[in-house]
């Protein structure tokens, strides 16, 4: 087998492969012999059909199948011989395909980039330091109470934070428009659910009252047919209900799976969950900075094939997340290309750090991570046992731990500055990173 390779770009290779005619004929004859053993042709007993008849009937298809298999087989032999690492499938162009002659074809494909991760010493990390104070727990208790607010009907004028049950009809130029009318809608005044002026226009209204609101849709309204258009809404208030926060009692604590421990026990459970959230938030922000630092210090070119594969994965995820009757390939690729490129680049860089530093997932840390995740459930022992009985899920945890070990490796060389902040600032979501 003859092989020659040409570099047409930094990552693209054009490989010419020549397969000897003898190897082709051997493969064709092998297939014809297999066919002869099972062929059923009128006038001949099974397995006794003359090879000349078999060849006449089946040689063309046998040769085509043999050629296809030989191209696939010799392609992988050639890339191993040339020490190439293909990224994606090749584009194959036959040059010579004649009977009795050598098979020659050209395979064009991309390869993985070869690089060494560097610049770790220049990466700067700001690591947040925070604690969960009593005031933070108090604030969280308020949040939990508000999340479980109940509304009780009252006989008074509506005010902000009240929940109204309303019917409304919207019209533009005297004509009702699609989506502009509803009955029995529950609306909390001040929630910002409706366009500007709608909720404000119902403050002071009482049950049974009808109000007419003349409003204008905002210029950036999602429905372009309605954007910047004046509309008239006739609103009937069916009822007014005021918010009632639940008491901090055993009934409320039971909503969160905490029983018979009183307020002190509930506070302790809330604080434990907040501390876990705090650790995860700080760890996540450090990891994001490490990954951004690796990207900036190691600009690499990546195969288009890998980006395309990642775009397809992101399309599928988007459809699964948002649903609808849309197929993944109907979503424009450009919506996902920047995110896909970033993921691919980071994946290659992280893999190279693992390789350079000979990292393997620390099984002790794997167990610790599983036990921490399990602690959020009512039966943590069962959750831990489930993970260790399910290899795919266990491997996912190992991958996360390995990424953490990559972060630790970078932190050992990077410049790390600790910064004391409040709990709220520490758990606040970080800004989305820029695309690579």
Swiss-Prot record:
Signal peptide bounds: none
Taxonomic lineage: Bacteria, Pseudomonadati, Pseudomonadota, Gammaproteobacteria, Pseudomonadales
Record note on domains: Consists of 3 domains; the N-terminus binds the ribosome, the middle domain has PPIase activity, while the C-terminus has intrinsic chaperone activity on its own.
Keywords: Cell cycle, Cell division, Chaperone, Cytoplasm, Isomerase, Rotamase
EC number: 5.2.1.8
GO CC entries: cytoplasm
Pfam family, one: Trigger_N
Keyword Chaperone among UniProt keywords: yes
Protein task: Involved in protein export. Acts as a chaperone by maintaining the newly synthesized protein in an open conformation. Functions as a peptidyl-prolyl cis-trans isomerase.
Similarity comment text for this entry: Belongs to the FKBP-type PPIase family. Tig subfamily.
Protein name according to UniProt: Trigger factor
Compartments where found: Cytoplasm
Xref: InterPro entries: PPIase_dom_sf (IPR046357), PPIase_FKBP_dom (IPR001179), Trig_fac (IPR005215), Trigger_fac_C (IPR008880), Trigger_fac_C_sf (IPR037041), Trigger_fac_ribosome-bd_bac (IPR008881), Trigger_fac_ribosome-bd_sf (IPR036611), Trigger_fact/SurA_dom_sf (IPR027304)
Xref: SUPFAM superfamilies: FKBP-like, Triger factor/SurA peptide-binding domain-like, Trigger factor ribosome-binding domain
GO molecular function, one term: peptidyl-prolyl cis-trans isomerase activity
Record NCBIfam families: tig (TIGR00115)
Residue intervals of the PPIase FKBP-type domain: 161-246
One GO BP: cell division
Gene: tig
Keyword Membrane: no
Catalyses which reaction(s): [protein]-peptidylproline (omega=180) = [protein]-peptidylproline (omega=0)
Organism of origin: Pseudomonas paraeruginosa (strain DSM 24068 / PA7)
